[in-house]
C-alpha cells in the first residue's frame, strides 16, 4: 500500500514538472519568435 502511494505521488510530481517545462518552453518560444 505504502509503495503504491509513493509511486502515485512521484508520478504526479513528474507530470507537474513536465507540464511546467512545456509551458515555460512555449512561453519563451512565443516571446522570442
UniProtKB/Swiss-Prot annotation:
InterPro entries attached to this UniProt entry: YkgR-like
UniProt KW Repressor keyword: no
Cytoplasmic side: 1-12
Alphabetic keyword roster: Cell inner membrane, Cell membrane, Membrane, Stress response, Transmembrane, Transmembrane helix
Inducing or repressing factors: Constitutively expressed, repressed in minimal glucose medium, by SDS/EDTA (envelope stress), at 10 degrees Celsius and H(2)O(2), induced in minimal glycerol medium, by thiol oxidant diamide, strongly induced at 45 degrees Celsius (at protein level). Transcription is dependent on CRP.
Record carries keyword Acetylation: no
Transmembrane region(s): 13-33
Gene Ontology CC entries for this record: plasma membrane
Subcellular location per the Swiss-Prot or TrEMBL entry: Cell inner membrane
Membrane topology of this protein: Single-pass membrane protein
NCBIfam families tied to this protein: membrane_YkgR
Name by which UniProt lists this protein: Uncharacterized membrane protein YkgR
Organism: Escherichia coli (strain K12)
